[in-house]
Structures are given as C-alpha cells and as structure tokens.
C-alpha cells in the first residue's frame, strides 16, 4: 500500500482537527504530515500518531514540494488563493469550502453518488455543503431506480453552524435576554434565515443546496427548492 504525504490547511480549526481524527481512525497511510494555519496559530503543537507536529504559517515559501494530498478547510478566500499553488507543487487538493463547487472545471464529489466525477480531475476536487452531502446517496438511488422530477428540501440547522455569536445568542435567550446576532429570538424557535438573503428570495445556503444537487446528479434542469 502506498503511503501519502498529507497537508492540512486550517489544521487548528474544528474541521482541521476532525481531518486528523478521521485519518487516525481509518489508519490512513500517512508517511509525512504538514500542518498549516494562520499566523496567529503558527507555532502550535499538534500530536498525530505519537508524533508532535508544529503548525506552520500558510504562506508561499512554506508550501512543501512533496505533498500528495492537501485537505483544505480554511474558508473560500484561502482556498481560492492557495489551492492553485498547492496544485502547482503537485498536490491533489480536496477543498471543503464553497470556493470551487460551482466551477464547471472542478468536480463536485460525493463518493457514494458520483465517484465517476473523479476521473481526469484537474488537481482540485470540491466537496459540497454538509446538508447536500447527507442526502446525495439516497437521491442517487432514487434517480437510478425511478427518476427524479422534483426535490423539496426542508433542513433544520444547528445554531452552532452560525458560530460562536449564534451560540452566545442562544445562551442569552435562555436567560431571557435579547439576541445580538440573530434578528429574532433563536431559543425555542426556527428562523428561515441561513446566510444572506438573495434577490430571488432564497438565502445563500439554500441556493447552494439547489445548485449543488443539480451538479452532483448531473441534472441541470431538475426542479429543486430548499428551506
């Protein structure tokens, strides 16, 4: 079995640490590990498989030349700037942000639904929104067996998805205090408002699900709505 030199961009964040956890749980054959983060996190120590690694600042001169796989979870702006640079050094980039998802030249992949999209990939591979990922294996089977005419999504997202400010609002509401980040009380409530509202009436997060579903299933005219 081949061993791989792996880089994690955004290594000190929640998703970056989850990358490390999954690599360890699955005994992924990591020969060498590179950890990258912002200047504020550079120098931190992270243990992996009994070895302590020092987090490097993400900048051009620190990009190693021998990386096989680069796992990105550092936001869309970072991915747009640095994914091509890692690719140019020979790495295959797997990006967790929304930066490349709708690029017509970049495959958007859920392995259980469209693994064939990985053939002849250009060196950057996108994975979709978490809400889209979990439903794709089911929709793929339904499409193959019966065909899809329309998809209606209703998703209920955790407050944690809006970050620390959202959690602060939840805690404040539970104490009888007003929200500062949310436009209305979030405790014991559901708000049809995730990310910004667009001109078409959908929110940005809802539109992601619509567009990603069509691309992954290769059904550009599929009727999809999401709330």
Q: Could you describe each region identified by the protein language model?
A:
Residues 1-186, 218-223:
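N-terminal Rossmann-like NAD(P) cofactor-binding subdomain of oxidoreductases
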Residues 189-227:
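Oxyanion-binding "anion nests"
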């Amino acid at each position: 079995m081949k061993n791989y030199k792996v880089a994690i961009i955004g290594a000190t964040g929640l998703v970056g640490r989850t990358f490390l956890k999954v690599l360890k749980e699955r005994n992924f054959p990591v020969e060498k590990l590179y950890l990258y983060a912002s200047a504020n996190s550079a120098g931190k120590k992270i243990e992996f498989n009994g070895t302590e690694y020092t987090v490097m600042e993400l900048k051009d001169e620190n990009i190693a030349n021998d990386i096989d796989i680069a796992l990105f979870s550092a936001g869309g702006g970072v991915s747009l700037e640095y994914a091509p640079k890692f690719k140019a050094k020979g790495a295959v980039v797997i990006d967790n942000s929304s930066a490349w998802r709708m690029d017509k030249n970049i495959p958007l992949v859920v392995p259980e639904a469209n693994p064939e999209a990985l053939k002849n990939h250009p060196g950057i591979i996108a994975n979709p929104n978490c809400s889209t990922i979990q439903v794709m294996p089911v929709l793929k089977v339904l499409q193959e067996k019966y065909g899809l005419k329309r998809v209606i999504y209703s998703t209920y997202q955790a407050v944690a998805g809006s970050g620390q400010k959202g959690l602060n609002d939840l805690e404040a509401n539970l104490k009888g205090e007003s929200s500062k980040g949310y436009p209305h009380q979030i405790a014991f409530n559901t708000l049809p408002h995730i990310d910004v509202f667009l001109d078409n009436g959908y929110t940005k997060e809802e539109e992601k699900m619509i567009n990603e579903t069509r691309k992954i299933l290769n059904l550009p005219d599929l009727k999809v709505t999401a709330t």
